[in-house]
């Protein structure tokens, strides 16, 4: 059993991390083929897609796992979750498509980009429960194959469209059009591959069970909204607060250099995948607090090294990830974004206290506080510092979330962190990175 657990964890890890590595290739392709204005448009719309994915799944994936492991109503849970998401997604598709012109006018984007965005959000929502079903059934290989296949197909289509399609066609519709077209095709292919799961589960709806699942899912939805705002809405605020003629280009250079933080993100994601199951499995061990402290210290040491390494060799990494010099003006933000993501990773490590003590609502509260800070500091700093203000707002937000979790964690579940060692190492990493 343990052997299968480790194998599945490794496979799910690959399915999570490998697509993110592939997106690095997409970033290089986009900044090579798109000007800063077009890349800014793509990045701005993509933020809304992230929020849309959260809203259209409304925490149902987490509720699915919780209720599948709770009782004997497994078939009812499967069919209720699938029916709920299918009906709500198709309803959204109908309403959003009818209002597509109004949405495009309100957001100030081309209508074809908005339509593609609607399709992508709906297609992604329709595969939430099929993917959850695969994980619940232990079909890790198929899960990883479809996840990686989706990203690989998207990458291949992007390479074809932007490199080999007639340049006259790209000039007529814009490169952003073909980026979203590739995403729609890849998402549609994923849905087609997973359609047999729809047949296995069947459509039935149990209202009383659905109400219970929605009550459980609501805090997850709030935390998801907060995450989407914290992670990407600085682009929305940049477009809102900067002059219209320069906003998209500024978002473009900011988003490209922001991608340099992906190395820290990959490290944090891998850490979460590996350590969260361990946190729960060792919660009853009398030495658990000491173990948690040691794990956090190791994480900070490794994260500090990544911060220092990427910052020192930024001039090398920019040639790999951002070969277009037009985007280099925003490289100033790289150490700030790396440090912000390190703070977020430390926050995830510190969050063990409310997970093992069943105070999970605290996570939603901290995320909402972070969202409020994101909004406040973006509005305060962007008019003054432009994209530098957006980067600083991200650092302040994640730093505050980390500090709040540490403060309350020590009150409710004291963990003997070696504060002096952490301060010295983290301080030295920051000092030599700026």
Per-segment meaning from a language model:
Residues 115, 145-198, 368-373, 387-408:
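Hydrophobic alpha-helical transmembrane segments
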């Amino acid at each position: 059993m343990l052997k299968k657990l480790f194998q599945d964890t490794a496979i799910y890890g690959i399915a999570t991390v490998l697509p993110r590595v592939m997106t690095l290739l997409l970033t290089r392709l986009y900044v090579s083929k798109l000007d800063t204005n077009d890349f800014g448009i793509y990045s701005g719309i993509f933020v809304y897609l992230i929020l849309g994915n959260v809203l259209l799944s409304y925490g149902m994936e987490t509720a699915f796992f919780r209720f599948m492991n709770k009782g004997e109503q497994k078939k009812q849970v499967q069919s209720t979750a699938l029916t709920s998401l299918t009906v709500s997604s198709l309803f959204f598709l109908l309403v959003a498509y009818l209002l597509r012109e109004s949405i495009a006018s309100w957001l100030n984007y081309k209508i074809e980009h908005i339509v593609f965005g609607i399709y992508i959000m709906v297609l992604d929502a329709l595969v939430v429960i099929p993917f959850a079903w695969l994980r619940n059934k232990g079909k890790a290989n198929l899960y990883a194959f479809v996840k990686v296949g989706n990203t690989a197909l998207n990458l291949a289509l992007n390479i074809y469209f932007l490199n080999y399609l007639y340049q006259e066609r790209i000039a007529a519709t814009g490169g952003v059009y073909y980026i979203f077209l590739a995403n729609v095709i890849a998402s549609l292919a994923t849905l087609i591959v997973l359609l047999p799961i729809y047949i296995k589960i069947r459509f039935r709806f149990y209202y009383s069970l659905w109400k219970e699942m929605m009550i459980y899912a609501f805090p997850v939805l709030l935390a998801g909204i907060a995450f989407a705002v914290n992670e990407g809405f600085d682009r929305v605020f940049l477009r809102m607060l900067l002059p219209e003629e320069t906003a998209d280009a500024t978002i473009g250079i900011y988003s490209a250099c922001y991608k340099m933080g992906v190395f820290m993100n990959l490290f944090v994601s891998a850490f979460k995948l590996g350590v969260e199951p361990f946190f729960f499995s060792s919660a009853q061990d009398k030495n658990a607090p000491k173990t948690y402290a040691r794990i956090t210290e190791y994480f900070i040491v490794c994260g500090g090294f990544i911060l220092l390494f990427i910052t020192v060799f930024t001039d090398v990494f920019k040639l790999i990830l951002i070969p277009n010099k037009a985007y280099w003006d925003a490289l100033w933000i790289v150490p700030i974004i790396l440090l912000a993501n390190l703070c977020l990773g430390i926050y995830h490590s510190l969050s063990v206290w409310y997970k093992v003590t069943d105070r999970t609502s605290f996570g939603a509260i901290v995320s909402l506080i972070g969202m409020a800070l994101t909004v406040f500091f973006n509005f305060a700093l962007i008019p003054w510092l432009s994209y530098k203000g957006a980067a600083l707002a991200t650092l302040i937000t994640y730093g505050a979330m980390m500090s709040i979790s540490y403060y309350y964690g020590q009150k409710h579940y004291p963990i003997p962190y070696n504060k002096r060692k952490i301060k010295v190492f983290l301080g030295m990493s920051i000092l030599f990175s700026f």
